[in-house]
């Protein structure tokens, strides 16, 4: 592996570029017309425009990405997260062209990247999972209604081929099912070029706990412990932390060990995250497997000292796990990540625009900021509104909260609105401080008037 094409944008592309350079490999960036002036485009060894702003014409354009790979002589492709990262057809095409797809083998994306088949496989291996359907016919509302009635309301509509909360819509009554189904299908098609949907029984007030794994192609699996991603808005993660606070450590360790055994038994490879729902009464329930790098990987890197992106690249290239990570990792301290979105913090509407000011605290021990933007860049309405990730790492959770709060308060961002006021209010809330957030708990700790004052 000598040259890697980075098939992504924004903070994901910037992070992968840093790992590629650290490994001494050549880098190729691709960009849409809307992203031509983003910093990483200029920092890569080579850069190629792949079309107009809409994702379907650029970052989801499989033919054009493969054409650029052939033209520039890249021998590997890193898909990042989102876009085509869990598209098994694209992974197969990359492999068939003689290139390395830097992720799990396409067969695992086929089986586990598809949320419905992943549940079936994990249930066969003994994991508890809430009620769900298989993939349902897109245009057969009679079948969809029958499936929803069988599960019992409320239900959750979920895309089978994507993640990040995009296209996930709770439905509380039969009357709204049809409209929600059409809306979710359109969102999934636009974001992932895959409109397939299924239904899941809605679980009230769970915590979202996920387990990070690395694996080689020789049957070895390594757990990088867990993350708590319970602070969400509309099923999109806002704040993540590692390790999970205020939880039964024995139960967490037992689940990590059990998942490692399952992944090793089936021969899973390279990188993956197993997402679970957790309630004190019911314990862990399987949710899905993300067959890709996660947005929130940085908090696991902070507490373990493992560079997950470099490890992913080396494992995809065929190295053994023991040569990539030479000693068993342990958790050191506590890390918290906040996702900064270009959105109105009161009404939660997108806030695209030009970054007239983008002043971030300089990196220092205990503080890391990931972004794909700089002052003067335009935050486009065509893509996910995340403009930066801010990661604080300290000896304990209270110190990490203070570090993150201070960093967010020191930022000066003008030209767009951001969710910083909302994040600050969450960090200061009694519920967050107690480690008691659930996936539906964000609204309970947000005061519109207080957010207005902070904004």
Where are these regions (language model features)?
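A short, GP-enriched loop/loop-strand-helix hinge that lies immediately N-terminal to
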Residues: 6-7, 20-58, 68-114, 128-135
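Residues within well-ordered alpha-helices
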Residues: 16, 37, 65, 90, ...
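A conserved helix-loop-beta module that forms one wall/lid of the active-site cleft
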Residues: 95, 99-160, 167
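Short small-residue beta-strand/loop micro-motif enriched in glycine and branched aliphatics
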Residues: 130, 165-167, 294-299
């Amino acid at each position: 592996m000598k040259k890697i094409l980075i098939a992504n944008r924004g903070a994901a592309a910037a992070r992968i570029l840093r790992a590629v350079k650290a490994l001494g490999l050549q880098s190729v960036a691709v960009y849409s017309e809307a992203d031509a002036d983003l910093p990483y485009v200029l920092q890569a060894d080579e850069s190629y425009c792949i079309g107009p702003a809409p994702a379907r014409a650029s970052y989801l354009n499989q033919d054009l990405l493969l054409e650029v790979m052939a033209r520039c002589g890249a021998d590997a492709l890193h898909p990042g997260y989102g876009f085509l990262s869990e598209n098994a057809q694209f992974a197969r095409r990359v492999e068939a062209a003689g290139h390395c797809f830097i992720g799990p083998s396409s067969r695992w994306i086929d089986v586990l990247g598809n949320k419905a088949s992943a549940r079936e496989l994990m249930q066969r291996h003994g994991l508890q999972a809430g009620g769900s359907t298989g993939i349902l016919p897109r245009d057969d509302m009679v079948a969809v209604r029958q499936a929803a009635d069988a599960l019992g309301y409320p239900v959750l509509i979920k895309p089978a081929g994507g993640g990040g909360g995009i296209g996930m819509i709770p439905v509380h009554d039969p009357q709204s099912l049809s409209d929600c189904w059409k809306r979710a299908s359109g969102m999934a098609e636009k974001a992932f070029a895959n409109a397939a949907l299924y239904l899941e029984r809605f679980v009230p007030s769970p915590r979202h706990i996920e387990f990070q794994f690395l694996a080689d192609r020789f049957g070895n699996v390594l757990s990088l412990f867990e993350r708590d991603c319970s602070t969400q808005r509309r099923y999109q993660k806002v704040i993540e932390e590692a390790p999970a606070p205020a939880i039964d450590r024995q139960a967490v360790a037992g689940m990590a060990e059990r998942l490692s055994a399952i992944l090793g038994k089936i021969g899973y490879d390279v990188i993956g995250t197993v997402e679970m729902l957790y309630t004190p009464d019911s314990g862990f329930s399987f949710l899905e497997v993300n067959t890709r790098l996660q947005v929130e990987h940085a908090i696991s890197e902070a507490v373990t000292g493992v560079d997950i992106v470099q490890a992913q690249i080396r494992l995809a290239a065929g190295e053994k796990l023991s040569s990539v990570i030479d000693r068993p990792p342990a958790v050191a301290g506590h890390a918290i990540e906040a996702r900064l979105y270009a959105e109105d913090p009161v009404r939660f509407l997108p806030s695209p625009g030009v970054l007239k000011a983008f002043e971030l605290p300089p990196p220092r021990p205990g503080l890391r900021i990931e972004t794909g933007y700089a002052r003067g860049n335009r935050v486009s309405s065509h893509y996910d509104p995340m403009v930066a990730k801010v990661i604080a790492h300290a000896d304990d959770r209270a110190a990490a909260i203070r570090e993150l709060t201070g960093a967010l308060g020191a930022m000066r961002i003008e030209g767009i609105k951001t969710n910083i006021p909302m994040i600050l209010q969450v960090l200061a809330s009694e519920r967050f401080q107690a480690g008691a957030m659930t996936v539906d708990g964000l609204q309970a700790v947000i005061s519109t008037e207080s957010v207005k004052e902070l904004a």
